[in-house]
Amino acid sequence: MSQSPDDLLRDDLLKPALLNLDRASLNRRRFMSKLIQYGGLAVGSGVLTACAGQPTSQTTSQAPDPAASSPAASPSGELKKITYGTNWYAQAEHGGFYQAVATGIYRDYGLDVTIKMGGPQVNGTQLLMGGAIDFFMGYVSDAIKAVQENIPKVTVAAMFQKDPQVLLAHPESKAKSLADLKDRPTFIGAAANTTFWPFLKAKFSYSDAQKRPYNFNPAPFLADKTAVQQGYLSSEPLAIRKEGGFEPLVFLLADYGYDPYSTTIECKQSLVDQDPDLVQRFVDASIKGWYSYLNGDPAPANALIKQDNPEMTDEQIQYSIEKMKEYGIVVSGSAETQGIGSMTDERWKSFFDTMSGEGIFPSSLDYKKAYTLKFVNKGVDAYKS
């Protein structure tokens, strides 16, 4: 939304449909950055929708005709076919990419982009390295793990400045910060042990004794007013409101120093070496798609999102967009001046130091192989044209 030693990144395998929580309320990219099951969502000249092996349908995209006059397009006017794999079912958290399809931004850059929608069970890194996709929606800890495993992929942009991971508490707890949640029973998934739990232990002295297994069932949290539960900013708070009838206290870990980037763009190192212009065009067009989605009319992207994921609701989409804006998930930090997608050496080092300090990665690992800054940090004005 998505890292663990067994590559089940950022959470457990599947979310059970308990307490009648509809999948739309839990549709998120959370913790699943390598567990993706691809349907055939082709976008650009058309959209083929498929979800977890369900029958496909085709919808013609309303993007404009290829524009050879665009300075970013190829001289012949031909579009370069590109496939981008997401890490979860279609949702607002992927909106900028869908917007770039729906409004023709990718075409303006000479690209015919196919988005392959994610879901559980399929390994995105394998698809990337095997050539089934050209770019992948990744996550920082997985990128560093790839260096450790000598997998030659690289992160070229980060659409989310803040990871949307949150902890939720009952209003009766009167907690004011993450520090107030120390020693409370905390429901977390197994993959938290290699992502945000080491951070909480290092900074707030959380202990393993307070951990409780989280299986995407909010019932234990709802039943215990002293309990804490992990969540995704744009999903669980809304689900708790609807199922529990109250507004949970929400603590965004990123606002307390948990600083990995999220919703990244990854590709093979060989693509960066052999065709940097292609990488730059895809990154630039995706960034413009995010500006359009957040600052303009998101309806074109939302239509594609709902077409691909029929269980996604307007309520969930609107809630997600509001939270992304309210908390500065996409635009905050260096992105405020350097543009969406921005990354810095300092942020990567900070996250690596925290994780290596807790023994997740060896301190000698050359983590800088996990990313490059050459395609981002152009400045906000660079994306206004």
Question: Which role fits each region the language model picked out?
Answer:
Residues M1-A50:
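N-terminal secretory signal peptides
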Residues A42, Q62-Y214, P218-A223, A227-S234, ...:
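Short, glycine-/small- and polar/acidic-enriched structural segments
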Residues A52-S61:
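Bacterial lipoprotein signal-peptidase II cleavage site
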Residues I105-D108, F204-Y206, E243-G245, E311-D314, ...:
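Short helix-capping segments at alpha-helix termini
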Residues T114, V122-N123, A254-D255, Q318-K325, ...:
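Short linear loop/turn motifs
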Residues S141, F216-P220, D224-T313:
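Pocket-lining segment of extracytoplasmic ligand-binding domains
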Residues D275-I360:
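Secondary-structure end/capping motifs
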Residues D345-S385:
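Conserved C-terminal helix/tail region of periplasmic/extracytoplasmic solute-binding proteins
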